[in-house]
Amino acid sequence: MARFVPSPPPNCLSYKSEGRLGEQDWQAHFKVPCCGVDPSQLESEEAEVDVRERDTQRDREPKRARDLTLRDSCTDNSMQFGTRTTAAEPGFMGTWQNADTNLLFRMSQQVPLACAGRVLGADFCPNLEEPDQRLEVQAIRCTLVNCTCECFQPGKINLRTCDQCKHGWVAHALDKLSTQHLYHPTQVEIVQSNVVFDISSLMLYGTQAVPVRLKILLDRLFSVLKQEEVLHILHGLGWTLRDYVRGYILQDAAGKVLDRWAIMSREEEIITLQQFLRFGETKSIVELMAIQEKEGQAVAVPSSKTDSDIRTFIESNNRTRSPSLLAHLENSNPSSIHHFENIPNSLAFLLPFQYINPVSAPLLGLPPNGLLLEQPGLRLREPSISTQNEYNESSESEVSPTPYKSDQTPNRNALTSITNVEPKTEPACVSPIQNSAPVSDLSKTEHPKSSFRIHRMRRMGSASRKGRVFCNACGKTFYDKGTLKIHYNAVHLKIKHRCTIEGCNMVFSSLRSRNRHSANPNPRLHMPMLRNNRDKDLIRATSGAATPVIASTKSNLTLTSPGRPPMGFTTPPLDPVLQNPLPSQLVFSGLKTVQPVPPFYRSLLTPGEMVSPPTSLPTSPIIPTSGTIEQHPPPPSEPIVPAVMMGTHEPSADLAPKKKPRKSSMPVKIEKEIIDTADEFDDEDDDPNDGGTVVNDMSHDNHCHSQDEMSPGMSVKDFSKHNRTRCISRTEIRRADSMTSEDQEPERDYENESESSEPKLGEESMEGDEHLHSEVSEKVLMNSERPDENHSEPSHQDVIKVKEEFTDPTYDMFYMSQYGLYNGGGASMAALHESFTSSLNYGSPQKFSPEGDLCSSPDPKICYVCKKSFKSSYSVKLHYRNVHLKEMHVCTVAGCNAAFPSRRSRDRHSANINLHRKLLTKELDDMSLDSSQPSLSKDLRDEFLMKIYGAQHPLGLDGREDASSPAGTEDSHLNGYGRGMAEDYMVLDLSTTSSLQSSSSVHSSRESDAGSDEGILLDDIDGASDSGESTHKAEAPTLPGSLGAEVSGSLMFSSLSGSNGGIMCNICHKMYSNKGTLRVHYKTVHLREMHKCKVPGCNMMFSSVRSRNRHSQNPNLHKNIPFTSID
């Protein structure tokens, strides 16, 4: 049973060793009672202790004289400390090795350290395992000449400075280190953990940084030891393995990041270098360093030239180095790297980290005996420049294949025979002129393996000469650099650049791509989305500025941060290296998403990526990394889109199909809910069950207007406001102030991708007949398939739902200036528009839901069309695009009832002044017809049709009632009429005398829209008729009975065409079964007939829309054409 023994006095750092005195003698020497020992027993031994002290004092003077003589006779002048022969004292290293009585090592084995910073301090309590163990106390004396310090006492501020003599720790520690190598240069020692502990204390005890040369040498010694021994040495000296591999301590015990470091002096470094002459693993390296030290080449002379000259010099010297060898060494097999080097295989060790839980040896995948088994199939996952490759940066010419030949005893560890071809060189920053170095400690059995590796590296390097390129990370070859880049980004790229827009989680492989993406004001590019597994860890790490809270190391967790909604990502399972208990795994797995500089370092290290002391040493607390993260605020002109959680899709939507591996390697685009990619624009009109979607009027809520919505650069609120929909009645009057197509560019980006390939507004009216005609079919929404149903319920029409359109009253003048831009009269048209809007009676009826209730809920997550609820407003928008797209876009000009499935078509129609000329002027007030002549309407209509089609075909359509007018003209005639609803509003109330005058105005308005849009006969003959019919159904001003009957009769055109089961060509009167066949007929047979001048009374026709528009917009060509009012 172990007994407690009190510590020595605090003014002396002492060690235990086997000797002739017992435990009571040691306690009596310090006059300290021991637990369980009678104090009277200590007094009985007092006389013997006095005799021992007197003998020790008498022998001290001869010993110092011998030390002085040895120092004067030493040929090495750099040795400033006193040395003793091995026979001088039996406590030197030369005699301790075989007996295994190293005091430093045995003390560290038996003493639990109370503080990592004062390992060699005086506050320790040895636990004796055997009651009869014989101990002796020996002080570490100062070896400097004329210093009478008997025992090293660590300083309160600097542990390496003795409080008694003010000399350093190295001057005292040499008292216990062997100098046998100075007298027997041909002999080498076996590397043992106790000896390495003593030598390591010279450079690690009380310091916070390690000189590079000493670290190179100490790494060689550590490579021979077991990992448990290495960890014990480091922890005993106040270092963690992570700090040692880094080369300096990043954070102190309190967690503070250090900005200054204590390091041993240059004189102490020279003294310590001599200790490495004792081992064959380091002897040749030290000899070369000594030669360079004497020649003065170890210190690089500062250059007065610029950095470019320095870079040119270094690059010119590096041309002799084999790139293939460097690439192979950077990505060599982990088994060829020592276990203490394999742990930090990324740049994360250069930055602050957090300790989570101490990781035990079984969790790290260590075998029971501490050996690291070789795994040839595993490779490093990152080509990062870390400390582990410090020794491998040398060319083939620098590696000397001649091993150091010496008598080597059997090794204690099998890892000694797994050493790699390592150059014994200093880093270039210490000695850039160094070009060659010998290699030591290579067995003869390694030559075949080394030659095979070099041959393989040469074979890999020759791949580039064949036109192929190989990946530096895994060695695979590819046809070209583009394929290699895709492979590298997908497999090996861990350093990514995140978009600076808040809420956008896009990551890019280059700053150039990231900056180009961040500068794009299009909010669609910055929408949050779920990414593939490769980017989940980055999204999780960047979800907050502060360090996220860890719920469990292995369970799923949610990272939260203030000011941002939680990201519902779950942590992937731990690396298989950590979960597999087999001893064949590596010590630690490769770190992921590690950034090379603090502003980009956001990754949270897993427990397997930590290095914690196995003992009960205090570890650094969790330090928030927010101080090292630079948040780049977005420019004021860039939108700040709030993050929207897209964790679940709507119930009816399936997951989007997986992308190809090549596509997933690039920055991931927005993953939307499932979207029908078919040509919905061409097929939407084919649905016979769709009700009339041409809305009479639309009222815009002024409170929802946003000037930010109007500017493409300030479309901040696009995603929060434009998702709201309005349940509006057929009788609502829409405001005339609207946005032009150019103002809708940010919103237009949400259109189907098929529209993105179509020409812009400025080009659409002049070029691209195919695009123009294919979009005309999107303009007017159909309702011809249900004429009977629509006429049967004149007073109970279902409410039409239209997506809210955002306008701003301040944009009225800009809107009119756009009209003037296309027609050459901005100021006059603005004045006309002002007078026109002042003459209108704007009404804002209450908005109704499909059930007839007021739409009082402003929740943007509910579809007011079908009353479905969604997870987010973004899901609602996708739902509208996929389901209710036909009900969204109505012409923004008051009085025009054309509706379109896309904003682009609607905006192009709204911006055409010729289609709304008579709606924007008061000339219609002067044209009136006698109210007693209701039958004049048909005659005028026939005359009008004769003027249009007189030279092309006769009016011989006697078989059909009122079917002589083409669809476009019929649409104009029927515009504004349909059913009689007493509560409905007039479309245009410009009359003051009679309703017939109003009807004349309305008919004149319809006549101006005879074409409805460019080339309406090409793709929208059915659309025009449906538009007219649905307009009639949706608009019903109060008219005299006779006029209403006349209008009802005119509806039979579309009714007959729909009831006959086919669609008639209005030019050759052939019947076709579906609209698709009719469209093909128009394109192939009547292409020239399609582009007729849109000015009523002008019979000019053109082969292209561009020519027709140029003709139609020229008012000088239509001066002699009188306006005709048709009833």
From Swiss-Prot:
Example of a GO biological process term: tongue development
GO CC annotations, alphabetized: chromatin; fibrillar center; nuclear body; nucleus
Zinc fingers, C2H2-type class: 469-492, 861-884, 1063-1086, 1091-1118
Compositional bias (Polar residues): 403-422
Modified residues (Phosphoserine): S589
Crosslink position(s): Glycyl lysine isopeptide (Lys-Gly) (interchain with G-Cter in SUMO2): K305, K424, K444, K449, K669, K922, K947
UniProt-listed Gene3D superfamilies: Classic Zinc Finger
Cellular compartment(s): Nucleus
Tissue: Highly expressed in ovary, testis and kidney. Expressed at moderate levels in skin and small intestine, and at lower levels in lung. Trace amounts of expression detected in liver and colon. Not detected in brain, spleen or thymus.
Skewed-composition ranges (Acidic residues): 676-689, 1010-1023
InterPro entries according to UniProt: Disconnected-like, Znf_C2H2_type
GO molecular function: DNA binding; rDNA binding; zinc ion binding
Biased composition (Basic and acidic residues): 49-67, 698-708, 747-772
Region (Disordered): 44-67, 386-450, 675-772, 955-976, 996-1041, 1107-1127
Compositional bias (Low complexity): 389-400
Keywords: Isopeptide bond, Metal-binding, Nucleus, Phosphoprotein, Repeat, Transcription, Transcription regulation, Ubl conjugation, Zinc, Zinc-finger
Function: Probable transcription factor specific for skin keratinocytes. May play a role in the differentiation of spermatozoa and oocytes. May also play an important role in early urinary-tract development.
Protein name per its UniProtKB record: Zinc finger protein basonuclin-2
Source species of the chain: Mus musculus
Taxonomic classification: Eukaryota, Metazoa, Chordata, Craniata, Vertebrata
